[in-house]
Amino acid sequence: MARIELDEVLRPREMFVLPGGKGVNAARAAVALGGRAITTGIAGGHAGRWIVEALSAEGLEPHWSFARAESRTAYVTVDESGSSVLVYERATPATPDEFAAFLRLLEERLLPACARAVVAGSIPAGLPPSDHGAIVEAARRAGVPLLVDATGPGLLAALEAGPDIVKIGRIEAVESGVVSEDATAVDAAVGLVERGARLAVATDGAQEVAAADASTVWRMSVPPIEALNPVGSGDSFNAALSLALMDGADVPTALARGVAAGSANALTKSAASLDPEVAAALEDDVTDTTIER
């Protein structure tokens, strides 16, 4: 819309209604970048049925488990200046039995069909944070490298299970208690490795992306762009990073592709609907610095 103003009726010029969530956005970006993606999660009620139908129509191969509670809705409003308002309903509940059914679906049917996996977002309300760790352990048993994008107690539970990759924002690392408030992106990445991640990536908005493993730190620049809508940029990063590693790229190359994909997404109006040619061009503007720990 032209301008976001409080206490006024807001009439958008364009609207996009589509299934969302961090995992779905990552799948959408993976397909945009030429990959194939299966989507899964716990869907509920009329909204959940619509999510599955819309994902199928979009070619995002839905294989979902179902719960009684209605799936939540999120609203994102962006104006011409790039300012945005995000209204996210709280996570809807699922029962332990409903999560157990989802985990069986994941272990028995989906992970065996995957080369890599991404688990992103929050566990449904009413479930213990340890269920994030259960997903990490399921992926390890299946031999599938897993990227975790989570915060708070769920992130800490995933770290205890020793995930292959963790990717979060620097501020999220601070809020989750991984590092102190004055920590840099490098500090956050190193802190995540010390907590259990084999490879950790910490983003810091448009400033910097840092990554670390047990022996090396990488610092990546972010291309200067005029962003239209940053929603889905982190998810696009996750998709590009995972695809690059699946194709055998080394870590700095995979990180550069992730940074470029996230930047390309920010140039679009709809989440995770990036142009792969724009992403490829932006990759040339990403520089990296490698530091031995």
Where does each model-flagged region fall?
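Glycine-rich phosphate/adenosyl-contacting loop at the front of the ribokinase-like
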Residues: 1-40, 49-50, 221, 227, ...
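Short beta-strand scaffold segments in enzyme catalytic cores
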Residues: 28, 73-77, 208-212
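A glycine-rich helix N-cap at a beta->alpha junction
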Residues: 56-69
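Conserved phosphate-binding/catalytic loop of the ribokinase/pfkB sugar-kinase fold
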Residues: 76-113
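Charged helix-capping and loop-helix junction motifs
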Residues: 100-104, 128-136, 181-187, 219-225
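Conserved beta-alpha-beta core of the PfkB/ribokinase-like small-molecule kinase fold
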Residues: 115-183
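Conserved phosphate-binding/catalytic region of the ribokinase-like
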Residues: 141, 156, 160, 183-293
